[in-house]
């Protein structure tokens, strides 16, 4: 770690644009970031203060050198600040005054796999925050007919490829173009675009072979400078940052990795942060930035100006929430605390008839809730933090069993909560991939519906329709024994039957399926039944259609129950039969 120094306010009008990288798992986000940074991230770092801040600056000199063979004249930005926490959920957690922290984004797509579930989630998030982005079409080295060329420039690389390779590349690019068009987005290869305000740039790259990265830097810098000048104008105000990771260092206490996106922060400043108990103030004990010499080297500084990735050591052991703001207080305490409170509000539509959601940060909470809502899954309550015993107890009391589930995104289940879950019927789904959690939640709901449907069938008469099979008449009375086809619903021993005119048609005494006695039978099936209290060819006849008699007292409940359409249609047929005699049948509470 180097000795203390001070970074002065930038003389330039523009600050560094903040760039976030998103994409589907295994499409090459981390490898691309490693190439851009010019260094690989260490798998494990020694104790003490972790020697890495989750944001990296690529200064203008490095960009100019990488793009010197391209038309890089007139660059005014001081560099690019890349967020080293890739992914659409991390993007959601990075806020700046209600909008996205990132000024621009890179969406990484495996050119051979195309658009995948997490790609779609990333597109949705980018559209939601109205964040401009480019596409890095990665893994062009895996396309057939690839020829290795010693150059980092895509424009040089493509000129030295066989026509077969060029054709294969274009086919894959236009597959992405066509898919993006389905999401309302126009796109094309970057060197074929005349108006970048209307068309998303696709830059073919190979992170593995280090091809196309200069073009990515060139396009990012050009777009930011040309179209985002007002957003990246430096403002000399009290420091505003977004916390992207909270570290509890044994040797140093609480360390906050953050992105300073406006203003200045200094050692000794009073800063406001949000905790699980609300906004509080604390003192800046020390500040660190990356040295730029290596990914594991930090420099301690007295002052930092935007935009920069910083590590802030604070003087108090606070339960700070990741994704929340950090604001320097300069005699404006009330205003800052209000700003912290407003920025920390969860923007999720809630519904009493919904489920519980927990996540590690506000943005994650909104991201998972957004995807659940898209699938018609309503949210009753959403909160930051691990799953607790209190959460389980609250969910257990919900009236609707379909809502007795807790979704946990990037959180743990506390030991006391695990014990409570085991003794309850509360479902818990946890994970760190949104689309997988959504899929698992949908499966859980469908399975719970089936369980509830079966319980209801066992507890009360189920609307059912049967037909007597004239070729299977075994006994005419005491009891009638006939073969029947269960056409809809479920019949049970003890069910009363009615005819299509509403007249009583006996009571099911027993059911046999392949010589085995059963208590109930679901449709569709052909079984033998014994029917008490009727005589064949008097009250019932071969080829008759009969219905299970439904008590009027359960009609309203059955109409609200989650049952198959065929069963609900049969219930309506029974109601129609009953109302021939009583027009108001089934309307009582």
From Swiss-Prot:
Residues 23-30 are annotated as: G1. Residues 84-87 are annotated as: G3. It comes from the Archaea. Keywords: GTP-binding, Initiation factor, Nucleotide-binding, Protein biosynthesis. The keyword DNA-binding does not apply. GO terms for cellular component: cytoplasm. PROSITE patterns: G_TR_2 (PS51722). Residues 14-231 form the tr-type G domain. Function in general translation initiation by promoting the binding of the formylmethionine-tRNA to ribosomes. Seems to function along with eIF-2. This is Probable translation initiation factor IF-2. It comes from Thermoplasma volcanium (strain ATCC 51530 / DSM 4299 / JCM 9571 / NBRC 15438 / GSS1).
């Amino acid at each position: 770690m180097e000795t203390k120094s001070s970074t002065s306010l930038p003389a330039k009008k523009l600050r560094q644009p903040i760039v976030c990288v998103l994409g589907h798992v295994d499409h090459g986000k981390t490898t691309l970031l490693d190439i851009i940074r010019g260094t690989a991230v260490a798998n494990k770092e020694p104790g003490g203060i972790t020697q890495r801040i989750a944001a990296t600056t690529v200064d203008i000199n490095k960009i100019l050198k990488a793009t010197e063979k391209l038309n890089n004249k007139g660059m005014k930005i001081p560099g690019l600040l890349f967020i080293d926490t890739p992914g659409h959920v991390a993007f959601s957690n990075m806020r700046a005054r209600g909008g996205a922290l990132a000024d621009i984004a890179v969406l990484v797509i495996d050119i051979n796999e195309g658009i995948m579930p997490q790609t779609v989630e990333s597109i949705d998030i980018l559209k939601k925050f109205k964040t401009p982005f480019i596409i890095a079409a990665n893994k062009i080295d895996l396309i057939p007919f690839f020829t290795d060329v010693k150059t980092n420039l895509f424009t040089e690389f493509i000129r030295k490829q066989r026509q077969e390779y060029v054709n294969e590349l274009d086919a894959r690019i236009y597959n992405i173009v066509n898919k993006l068009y389905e999401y309302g987005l126009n796109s094309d290869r970057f060197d074929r675009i005349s108006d970048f305000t209307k068309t998303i740039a696709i830059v073919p790259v190979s992170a593995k072979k280090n091809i196309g990265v200069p073009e990515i830097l060139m396009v990012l810098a050009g777009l930011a400078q040309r179209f985002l000048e007002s957003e990246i104008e430096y403002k000399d105000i009290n420091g505003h940052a977004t916390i992207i990771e909270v570290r509890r260092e044994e040797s140093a206490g609480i360390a906050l990795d953050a992105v300073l996106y406006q203003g200045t922060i200094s050692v000794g400043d009073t800063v406001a942060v949000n905790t699980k108990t609300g906004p509080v103030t604390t003192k800046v004990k020390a500040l660190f930035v990356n040295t730029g010499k290596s990914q594991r080297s930090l420099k301690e500084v007295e002052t930092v100006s935007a935009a920069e990735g910083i590590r802030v050591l604070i003087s108090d052991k606070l339960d700070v929430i990741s994704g929340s703001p950090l604001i320097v207080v300069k005699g404006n305490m009330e205003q800052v605390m209000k700003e912290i409170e407003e920025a920390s509000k969860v923007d999720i539509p809630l519904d009493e008839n919904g489920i519980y959601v927990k996540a590690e940060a506000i943005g994650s909470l909104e991201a998972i809730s957004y995807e659940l809502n898209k699938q018609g899954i309503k949210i009753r309550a959403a909160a930051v933090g691990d799953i607790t015993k209190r959460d389980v107890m609250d969910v257990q009391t919900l009236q609707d069993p379909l809502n007795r589930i807790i979704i946990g995104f990037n959180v743990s289940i506390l030991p006391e909560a695990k014990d409570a879950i085991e003794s309850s019927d509360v479902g818990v789904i946890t994970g760190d991939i949104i689309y997988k959690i959504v899929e698992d939640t949908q499966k859980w709901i469908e399975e719970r519906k089936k369980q509830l449907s079966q319980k209801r069938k066992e507890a009360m008469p189920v609307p059912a329709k049967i037909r007597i099979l004239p070729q299977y008449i075994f006994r005419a009375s005491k009891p009638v024994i006939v073969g029947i086809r269960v056409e809809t619903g479920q019949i049970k021993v003890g069910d009363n039957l009615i005819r299509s005119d509403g007249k009583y048609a006996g009571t099911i005494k027993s059911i046999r399926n392949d010589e085995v006695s059963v208590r109930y039978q679901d449709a569709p099936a052909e079984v033998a039944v014994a029917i008490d209290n009727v005589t064949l060819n008097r009250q019932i006849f071969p080829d008759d259609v009969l219905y299970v008699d439904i008590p009027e007292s359960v009609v309203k409940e059955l109409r609200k129950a989650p049952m198959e359409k065929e069963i609900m249609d049969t219930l309506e047929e029974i109601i129609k039969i009953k109302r021939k005699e009583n027009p108001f049948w089934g309307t009582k509470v």
